[in-house]
């Protein structure tokens, strides 16, 4: 059956800056509002999670807000121009009620500009060799928040595991014979290196132990993590002591940083001219490990509950593929 498109179309772009748990119910609210509308219909609704927003290089429309946590694009149509305009404005109000902003495009050119970011979703795999494991998970829209939470749990665990893999590789490197540049001298390597290798190894091992504990205690109150590890914990001032470490991670109030916790301190330890080859070796290990990181990204077509769940991978990295397949098993259990 071919349907004639209504005469008037408005494209609404909604940017959400609060938590994903706060933002996702807006999808159901928009759907229900337009399903009940007498003369306006929802012709298209697309959802991008924050990983897609970052990957496509999304240019935020709201001034001074930073990168949104979620973006929705909606086409609303009607033969009644006043009705479609009012509906688009109401959708913007729904977004603002959930820590978001709404923007309306009227002309075909402006509408096309709004949709450009959606056409670049293949960029999610730009850090790999453009290979992805794709899953179409169909869930009730009312459960999207719960599903997103589950995916975020998987992503947080994958992120910490990748950092632990890096720590293990660095420990192995630092435990071996380090490449000291003797700068044309006859001094023994041990004398030139001093205690720097031991200090570096002890530092990496301490960070690894902290992240091991964190991975095993994601449901523990943040206060316990802070009490145990003090100033080494990267928690935002607005983080709540009684929330779980997972919740703080999910809502961007807690982070673990390879740059701040590992690579920067190692660069300070190995800061001498004799250490350039050591730093080069550390950098290669870091780059190789980061290349193998696995994450799950979500976007959704049409607001119909068909959630495209994508895992970018390098097809030549067997370990990365195995990690991705284990994640798929968890995703399938979550969906069921």
Predicted features along the sequence, with ranges:
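Noncatalytic alpha-helical scaffold of FAD-dependent oxidoreductases
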Residues: 1-336
């Amino acid at each position: 059956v071919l349907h004639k498109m209504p005469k008037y179309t408005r494209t609404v772009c909604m940017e959400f800056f609060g938590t994903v748990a706060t933002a996702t119910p807006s999808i159901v609210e928009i759907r229900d509002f337009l399903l009940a509308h007498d003369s306006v219909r929802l012709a298209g609704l697309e959802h991008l999670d924050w990983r897609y927003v970052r990957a496509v290089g999304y240019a935020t429309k709201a001034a001074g807000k930073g990168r949104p946590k979620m973006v929705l694009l909606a086409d609303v149509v009607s033969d009644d121009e006043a009705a479609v305009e009012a509906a688009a404005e109401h959708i913007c109000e729904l977004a603002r009620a959930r820590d978001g902003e709404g923007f309306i495009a009227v002309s075909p050119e402006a509408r096309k500009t709004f949709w450009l970011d959606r056409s670049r979703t293949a960029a999610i795999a730009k850090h790999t060799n453009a290979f992805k494991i794709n899953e179409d998970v169909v869930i009730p829209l009312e459960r999207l928040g719960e599903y997103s939470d589950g995916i975020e749990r998987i992503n947080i665990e994958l992120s910490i595991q990748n950092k632990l893999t890096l720590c293990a590789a660095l420990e192995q490197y630092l435990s071996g014979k380090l490449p000291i540049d003797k700068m044309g001298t006859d001094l023994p390597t041990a004398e030139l290196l001093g205690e720097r290798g031991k200090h570096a190894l002890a530092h990496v091992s301490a960070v690894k132990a902290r992240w091991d504990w964190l991975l095993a205690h994601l449901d523990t109150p943040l206060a316990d993590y802070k009490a145990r590890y003090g100033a080494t914990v990267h928690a935002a001032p607005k983080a709540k002591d009684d929330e779980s470490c997972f919740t703080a991670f999910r809502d961007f109030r807690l982070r673990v940083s390879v740059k701040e916790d590992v690579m920067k301190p190692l660069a300070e330890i190995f800061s001498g001219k004799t250490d350039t080859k050591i730093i080069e070796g550390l950098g290669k290990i870091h780059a190789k490990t980061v290349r193998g990181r696995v994450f799950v990204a979500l976007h959704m077509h049409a607001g119909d509950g068909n959630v495209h769940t994508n895992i970018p991978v390098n097809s030549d990295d067997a370990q990365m593929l195995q990690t991705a397949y284990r994640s798929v098993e968890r995703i399938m259990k979550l969906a069921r």
